[in-house]
């Protein structure tokens, strides 16, 4: 039996795009400053696959990052967007190899997933195991939009 697939919106408005671009610049600048010279990638792009799954208590994002060290990954949640950025460095190789087949990707990567709902990001967690990055965002009760009675007093204003 196959699991249900929920629809998520991936269109990000232009103001949020500018914020996201700034966040990505900061994340990559931090990686440049902290990664050892031999783990830094100067060109190339990597496109790791990801899954987004929802349970009753959380949303989980699983990203395939085989060969990427934990110190080469940054995770950020802003507004309703989860951003995963990092660098996958090529393994040590011989000088001037002759390739017969090239399928693996190396370089910087950034994935952004827009999520709906309310999350307790202070309890969010991420773990890297066997080449899979698992990010768990616990849900909290949505309070926005619920009616809330504001008491009315007769007399002077309160500050």
Regions of interest found by a model, annotated:
Residues 69-74, 114-144:
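Beta-rich strand-turn-strand
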Residues 138-159:
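C-terminal tail/sorting-segment detector
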Residues 1-62, 85, 90-94, 157-159:
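N-terminal leader/pre-domain low-complexity segments
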Residues 92-112:
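An anionic, turn-rich surface loop/hairpin at beta-sheet edges
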Residues 58, 81-83, 132-134:
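Structural motif
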Residues 69-97:
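Core FKBP-type peptidyl-prolyl cis-trans isomerase
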Residues 59-65, 134-137:
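Short, well-ordered beta-strand segments enriched in hydrophobic/aromatic residues
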């Amino acid at each position: 039996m196959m699991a249900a697939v929920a629809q998520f919106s991936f269109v990000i408005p232009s103001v949020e795009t500018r914020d996201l671009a700034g966040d990505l610049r900061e994340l990559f600048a931090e990686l440049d400053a902290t990664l050892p010279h031999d783990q830094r990638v100067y060109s190339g792009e990597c496109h790791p696959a990801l899954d987004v799954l929802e349970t009753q208590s959380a949303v989980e994002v699983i990203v395939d990052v085989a060969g990427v060290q934990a110190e080469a990954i940054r995770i950020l949640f802003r507004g309703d967007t989860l951003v995963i950025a990092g660098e996958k460095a090529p393994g040590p190789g011989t000088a001037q190899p002759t390739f017969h087949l090239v399928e693996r990707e190396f370089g910087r990567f950034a994935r952004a997933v827009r999520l709906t709902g309310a999350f307790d990001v202070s309890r969010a967690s991420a773990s890297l195991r066997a080449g899979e990055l698992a990010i768990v965002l616990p849900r909290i009760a949505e309070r926005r939009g619920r009616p809330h009675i504001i008491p009315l007093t007769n007399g002077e204003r309160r500050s």
